[in-house]
């Protein structure tokens, strides 16, 4: 079989090492130049490669598509017009694991926000119960890296991965929440929502369980399963003090992150999912209470001169940033917005900040978008993060919280949200 890796990011890079051990003919195609290191590697292993998606892609039997490649791209057009079979690294790896290990249980986590935290927390709980657990997917570790002999596979799944996968079906699908996002990639909001729904529908049709945020159920086309006991919903109504109540079970949460509104749904989804996997309340409690937030997800970086610095660089959309800032209502906080907007309505975020923030500092591409809305005197505009920190040194007082939850993609000034987060941390140390 002629297999073409379309795009050569982390996931396809990892998959290539496995494919080289197969009898397939492997090509690599992407729309930009390869690094010299990549080219040396390809030549050493007799792998044909091309830029600008031409003959190699057109003549393959199977295209393994990097998730970020949009459906209106040149590569997608070639795939669709030539009726080339397609898949993703995630789906291809899942199929291979299932062939070798039919008892493997897959938990797929999707949603607009909280995917990475929920994936990490479910994985953290399951590792307490069973060390033979893999945690990865869109969160950063490709499934191709996993051994085929594990019991649990906890994978974050993006809407892009769902779009390019035809059959990937976890035993349990988890939907953290839904809000407008990636409208520069998907056709429209309904297309984005129904792409997310596909993962849940596949699980339900195969006899599996869908764990769904109660607020999102009506936004999805799940009518045929609405009354099904296999749709399990969770909501903040399940919280009583520092307890989560689910059916006849109670989980006591003493982790400080439970005090922040933004993490509550992630913890609820994780507790409900693992309870339905038969994990004991005691293990779930121990795991939740020892869990630490992911890097750049409303992470407390430092308390310095009476000021707390929170890094939420991973907040690349309005919904995520809104929920982060909402967690600081009633406290003195300074908000920092930046990045490239995603065709979203900023109104709820702007109104939240106008009402509750002490000051709002905006830099980067976000400035043009923010200035389209009615603002008040709290909004200040700077050219870069260094200028932001100079201004912070003038206005910060004891008891303030500096919250960097940008609400936009990082690509205006940074390679990714991690690089943006690292820059913020560096400036906190220097300040």
Swiss-Prot record:
Subcellular location: Cytoplasm
Protein keywords: ATP-binding, Cell cycle, Cell division, Cell shape, Cell wall biogenesis/degradation, Cytoplasm, Ligase, Nucleotide-binding, Peptidoglycan synthesis
A GO BP annotation: cell wall organization
Binding site for ATP: 111-117
Domain of life of the native organism: Bacteria
One Pfam entry name: Mur_ligase_M
Family: Belongs to the MurCDEF family.
Protein name: UDP-N-acetylmuramoylalanine--D-glutamate ligase
Native species: Petrotoga mobilis (strain DSM 10674 / SJ95)
Lineage summary: Bacteria, Thermotogati, Thermotogota, Thermotogae, Petrotogales
Gene that encodes the chain: murD
């Amino acid at each position: 079989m002629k297999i073409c890796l379309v795009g050569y990011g982390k996931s396809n890079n990892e998959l290539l090492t496995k494919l080289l051990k197969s009898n397939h003919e492997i090509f690599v195609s992407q729309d930009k130049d390869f690094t010299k290191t990549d080219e040396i590697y390809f030549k050493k292993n007799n792998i044909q490669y091309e830029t600008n998606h031409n003959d190699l892609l057109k003549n393959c039997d199977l295209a393994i598509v990097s998730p970020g490649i949009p459906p209106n791209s040149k590569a997608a057009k070639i795939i669709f017009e030539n009726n080339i079979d397609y898949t993703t690294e995630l789906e291809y790896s899942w199929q291979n694991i299932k062939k070798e290990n039919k008892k493997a249980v897959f938990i797929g986590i999707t949603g607009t926000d909280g995917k990475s935290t929920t994936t990490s927390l479910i994985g953290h709980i399951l590792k307490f119960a069973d060390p033979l657990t893999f945690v990865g997917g869109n969160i950063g570790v490709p499934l191709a890296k996993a051994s085929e002999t594990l019991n649990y596979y906890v994978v974050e799944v993006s809407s892009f991965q769902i779009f390019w996968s035809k059959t990937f079906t976890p035993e349990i699908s988890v939907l953290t929440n839904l809000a407008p996002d990636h409208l520069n990639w998907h056709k429209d909001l309904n297309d984005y929502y129904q792409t997310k729904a596909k993962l849940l529908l596949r699980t339900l049709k195969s006899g599996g369980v869908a764990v769904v945020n109660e607020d999102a159920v009506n936004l999805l086309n799940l009518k045929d399963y609405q009354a099904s006991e296999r749709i399990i919903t969770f909501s903040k109504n399940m919280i009583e003090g520092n307890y989560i109540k689910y059916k006849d079970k109670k989980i006591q949460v003493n982790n400080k992150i439970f005090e922040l509104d933004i993490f509550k749904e992630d913890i609820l989804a994780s507790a409900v999912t693992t309870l339905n996997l038969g994990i004991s309340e005691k293990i779930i409690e121990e795991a939740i209470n020892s869990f630490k937030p992911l890097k750049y997800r409303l992470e407390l970086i430092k308390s310095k001169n009476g000021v707390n610095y929170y890094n939420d660089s991973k907040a690349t959309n309005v919904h995520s940033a809104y929920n982060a800032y909402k967690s600081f209502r009633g406290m003195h906080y300074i908000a920092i917005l930046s990045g490239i907007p995603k065709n979203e309505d900023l109104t709820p975020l702007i109104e939240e900040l106008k009402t509750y923030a002490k000051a709002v500092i905006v830099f980067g591409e976000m400035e043009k978008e923010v200035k389209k809305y009615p603002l008040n005197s709290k909004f200040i505009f700077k050219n870069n993060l260094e200028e932001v920190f100079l201004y912070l040194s003038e206005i910060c007082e004891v008891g303030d919280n500096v919250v960097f939850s940008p609400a936009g993609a990082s690509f205006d000034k940074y390679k990714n949200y991690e690089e943006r987060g690292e820059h913020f941390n560096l400036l906190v140390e220097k300040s």
